C-alpha cells in the first residue's frame, strides 16, 4: 500500500475541484489548472476531501501511479492557492537579466542577448543578480527554471553562471593552485 497515496487531500475554502472521469480541474484564487490522469487511477471526491486509489495495488506500476497522482493533485491545489516559485542566482562579470514584456532577456557573455518567452501562467521578477520565477503549475515553474539554468551552467573554477539559490557548486583548484600544492 502506498504511504503517500492513501492520505486524503483536504480541499481548502475558496478552491473548487471538478472530477470528470480521469480529468481533474482545480480552480482557485490564483487561477485554474487541469490535468488528465492515467486510466488505472481512481479519483473520488467526497465533500471537501479527495481520495486517490488504483485498480490493482499489488502491481508495481500502479503503486507508483498511486502516490504520484495524489501528489500531483495536491500540488495543483497548492498552486492555485499559494503558487510556486524558484530563485536563480546569476554570477559573473557582465551577466545580467531583465524582464521585457512577456520575455526574459539574459546577457550571459554570448555575442547576442538570449530571449526566453514565458510559458502561460509563469512570471519572473529580476532583482540585481536574483531571478524569481513564479507560477501556479509546479512542473512549468521547475521546467522554465531548469531551461534558464541550462543556458549557462556554473563552471567549477570561478563559479560563473546561473545556479539555484542555495545550490552548492563544487569548486576545483586552478592550475596555479595545483602547481603550488605539488611542490
What annotation goes with each model-predicted range?
Residues 2-146, 150-183:
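N-terminal intrinsically disordered, cationic/polar leader segments
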Amino acid at each position: 500500500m502506498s504511504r503517500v497515496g492513501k492520505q486524503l487531500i483536504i480541499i481548502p475554502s475558496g478552491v473548487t475541484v471538478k472530477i470528470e472521469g480521469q480529468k481533474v480541474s482545480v480552480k482557485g484564487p490564483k487561477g485554474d489548472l487541469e490535468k488528465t490522469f492515467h486510466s488505472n487511477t481512481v479519483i473520488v471526491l467526497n465533500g471537501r476531501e479527495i481520495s486517490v486509489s488504483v485498480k490493482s495495488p499489488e502491481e508495481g506500476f500502479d503503486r507508483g501511479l498511486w502516490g504520484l497522482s495524489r501528489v500531483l493533485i495536491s500540488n495543483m491545489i497548492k498552486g492555485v492557492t499559494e503558487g510556486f516559485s524558484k530563485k536563480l542566482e546569476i554570477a559573473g562579470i557582465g551577466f545580467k537579466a531583465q524582464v521585457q514584456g512577456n520575455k526574459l532577456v539574459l546577457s550571459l557573455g554570448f555575442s547576442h542577448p538570449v530571449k526566453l518567452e514565458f510559458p502561460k501562467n509563469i512570471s519572473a521578477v529580476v532583482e540585481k543578480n536574483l531571478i524569481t520565477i513564479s507560477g501556479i503549475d509546479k512542473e512549468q515553474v521547475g521546467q522554465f527554471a531548469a531551461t534558464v539554468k541550462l543556458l549557462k551552467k556554473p563552471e567549477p573554477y570561478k563559479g560563473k553562471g546561473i545556479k539555484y539559490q542555495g545550490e552548492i557548486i563544487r569548486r576545483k583548484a586552478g592550475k596555479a593552485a595545483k602547481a603550488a600544492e605539488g611542490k
